[in-house]
């Protein structure tokens, strides 16, 4: 398979994953997720197994209303069965009944297991001042 074909496939998988989250399609999200999957973000680091992921998705405290993966995504193949994708994303969510829009830089590591790609690692860094000066602390 040509490199550009695999790159397109990885970007397609990433979009499908986001769409599964938006649609609250737990089965598709689980099919696309390694067991366990390492996740990092503003809340810290976690290793999430399928049972935990399913529970999280079914009882989410937020709703993903829309998402846009911005142009400029980068895909790097580390071998026949490992690929990394990094991109910027805009997310529109409803959190505790209120609309929230955020921009973030995300990355995922995809591995091919038994002939199918699964996400083994996902990271998200919310865009903004790298020193956090644009964030408001609540007492």
Residue ranges, per PLM feature:
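A beta-strand edge to alpha-helix "cap/lid" segment located at domain peripheries
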Residues: 2-31, 38-139
């Amino acid at each position: 398979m040509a490199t550009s074909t695999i790159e397109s496939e990885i970007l397609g998988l990433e979009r499908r994953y986001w769409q599964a989250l938006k649609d609250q399609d737990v089965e598709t999200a689980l099919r696309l997720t390694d067991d366990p999957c390492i996740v990092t973000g503003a809340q810290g680091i976690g290793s999430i197994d399928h049972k935990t992921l399913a529970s999280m998705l079914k009882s989410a405290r937020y709703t993903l209303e829309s998402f846009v993966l911005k142009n400029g995504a980068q895909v790097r193949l580390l071998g026949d069965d490992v690929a990394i994708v990094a991109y910027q994303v805009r997310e529109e969510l409803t959190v505790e009944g209120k609309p929230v829009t955020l921009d973030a830089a995300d990355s995922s590591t995809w591995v091919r297991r038994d002939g199918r790609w699964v996400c083994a690692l996902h990271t998200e860094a919310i865009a903004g001042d790298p020193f956090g000066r644009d964030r408001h602390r609540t007492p």
